[in-house]
Amino acid sequence: MSWYRAASVGRRLVASGRILAGRRGAAGAAGSGMGNSTSSFWGKSATTPVNQIQETISNNCVVIFSKSSCSYCSMAKKIFHDMNVNYKVVELDMVEYGSQFQEALYKMTGERTVPRIFVNGIFIGGAADTHRLHKEGKLLPLVHQCYLNKSKRKDVE
């Protein structure tokens, strides 16, 4: 299965520090160039699972490692969707070497469960942690900081 079919890819647009437009599943970055690759590198032997995970995390402000039938994963995705925040989803049960990626995530985060959620390159936890950060008003500022950082890096280039 291709990366595009296995993951939802969203657009990222930034204007005055506010995230605009785009919905989960929409392809392309509308010229923003902010890590919306639809290339199929998942499972290629030349790159280790950890390297592939790290590349995905560094190229996207929000990454959710999920399983398609997981209710906690759905809850986490809904939080970002309801905040109109775009995110990349990697459905581990739909990629060829999903169990190897889940093992790599375990080594990186200390947990085998899904979802495993990264914001601004930082592991923030699972669904309960994401819900708590959202209720405390801390989740959206983390996302905004990522978009600001990416915008600054793009200006420097």
From Swiss-Prot:
Transit sequence range: 1-19
Paired cysteines (S-S): 70-73
Activity: how regulated: The 2Fe-2S present in the homodimer leads to inactivation of the enzyme. The 2Fe-2S may serve as a redox sensor: the presence of one-electron oxidants or reductants leading to the loss of the 2Fe-2S cluster, subsequent monomerization and activation of the enzyme.
Residues that, per the record, bind glutathione: 67, 102, 114
Short name of one Pfam family: Glutaredoxin
An individual GO BP term: cellular response to superoxide
Matches recorded under InterPro entries: Glutaredoxin, Glutaredoxin_euk/vir, Glutaredoxin_subgr, Thioredoxin-like_sf
SUPFAM superfamilies: Thioredoxin-like
Gene3D superfamilies in the cross-refs: Glutaredoxin (3.40.30.10)
Self-association and partners: Monomer; active form. Homodimer; inactive form. The homodimer is probably linked by 1 2Fe-2S cluster.
Family: Belongs to the glutaredoxin family.
Name of the protein described by the UniProt record: Glutaredoxin-2, mitochondrial
